[in-house]
Structure formats: structure tokens, C-alpha cells
């Protein structure tokens, strides 16, 4: 899946779970 283990934000993300962790990573 795309974006796993990479930084993300609430406005822009592409994580497996579709959300960002509190640490700002997928």
C-alpha cells in the first residue's frame, strides 16, 4: 500500500488505514 511508514498530515495523506497517527506517520 502507498504511504506506509512515511510522514503524513490530516489534510493530505495516502495511508493504508486512511488516517494518520498522532506522530504524523502512516
Curated annotation (Swiss-Prot):
Highest taxon, organism lineage: Eukaryota
Q: What is its main location?
A: secreted
SS bond partners: 1-16, 8-20, 15-26
Domain comment, as recorded = The presence of a 'disulfide through disulfide knot' structurally defines this protein as a knottin.
Instruction: Describe tissue expression.
Output: Expressed by the venom duct.
Is Amino-acid biosynthesis there in the keyword field?
no
> What is the official name of this protein in its record?
Omega-conotoxin CVIC
Record-linked SUPFAM superfamilies:
omega toxin-like
Q: Where in the cell is it found?
A: Secreted
Q: Which residues carry this modification: Cysteine amide?
A: 26
**Any GO CC annotation of this UniProt entry:** host cell presynaptic membrane
Q: Which GO terms describe its molecular function?
A: calcium channel regulator activity; ion channel inhibitor activity; toxin activity
Q: Which family does it belong to?
A: Belongs to the conotoxin O1 superfamily.
Keyword annotations: Amidation, Calcium channel impairing toxin, Disulfide bond, Ion channel impairing toxin, Knottin, Neurotoxin, Presynaptic neurotoxin, Secreted, Toxin, Voltage-gated calcium channel impairing toxin
Entry keyword Repressor: no
Q: What function is annotated for this protein?
A: Omega-conotoxins act at presynaptic membranes, they bind and block voltage-gated calcium channels (Cav). This toxin blocks N-, P- and Q-type calcium channels.
